[in-house]
Amino acid sequence: MDWDLFLKIVDDISSYNPNAFIQLFFVGEPLLHARILDMIRYLKQNNLRVHLATNATILDETMAHGLINAGLDHITFSFEGTDKETYESIRINAKYESVLENIFRFLRIKGQEKAHIHTVIEIIEMAAIKDKIPDFIKKFDGLPVDQIRIKTFLGWAGTVDESKMAVKTYGTPNYPCNRPWRMLAITWDGLFLPCCVDAGRKYVMGDAHRDSVEDIWNGEKIQYIRKKLNTGNYSEIELCKNCNDIEALSERFTFPEINADHAGST
């Protein structure tokens, strides 16, 4: 993302919602950005909470110290596979032992510096590794990990075939997905999307170069999605009809209260 665009977006968010929780990643590896530490520092200067998710392939000692010293609040390590064979078949050109050591080193530094960074290890539950997960979790015994999360395979709104990899779940949720009530996604080039699952940009709602967060948050396009989800009409939204990542209502990440006209109430 262009630096000036980043500054505009952050200033816009901090003005509209000073309690926002910023997830500084979207369909890419955030540590590849040359100014990632500057981004975190600027967000913290604006008193915003910052979460970063990384695959840790390039997380060296210098970057580990940098993330901690920049004031990062939350970090999630995405690890695809519990053993060398599975991991390296998915994360091409990455080395299982090296990436694990990157994570272990970060955790050791976190402990040494007594850093208050909420730390999550995230594993996708796949049929091939389901029985190996307990042994993998034991690798983190004694290290300052706050949570080890086993995630359902995400089909990215129907764009990825999960049939050969995922542990199957069945049924239709009896609650509306909460994402359009608690978040917006912004692409590297400034496009507003209703949620982070829209990697294919199926439902562009505006452009951060010209539109404000407040206008998009209360705009007609996101209102339409909220109303459809609130009545269970997932099939009427192209983005949502094949999504397997529907979430129950949560207050973990919130925007300011939406007034009744914008809430999609029935």
Language model regions located:
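Short secondary-structure boundary micro-motifs
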Residues: F6-K8, L72, V167-Y170, G190
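Radical SAM/AdoMet-radical enzyme domain recognition
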Residues: M1-F140, D146-K151
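Short hydrophobic/aromatic beta-strand element in the GNAT-like acyltransferase core
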Residues: M183
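Short, small/polar residue-rich loop motifs at catalytic or cofactor-binding pockets
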Residues: N178-P180
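Short catalytic/ligand-binding loop motif for oxyanion handling, primarily in non-cytosolic enzymes
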Residues: L32-H33, D60, D83-T86, A128-I133, ...
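C-terminal accessory region of radical SAM enzymes
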Residues: R108-H118, K138-Y175, L191-F192, V197-S250
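Short, acidic, Ser/Thr-enriched surface-loop or helix-capping motifs
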Residues: I186-T187
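Short cysteine/histidine-rich metal-coordination sites, predominantly Zn2+-binding motifs
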Residues: M1-L5, F255-S265
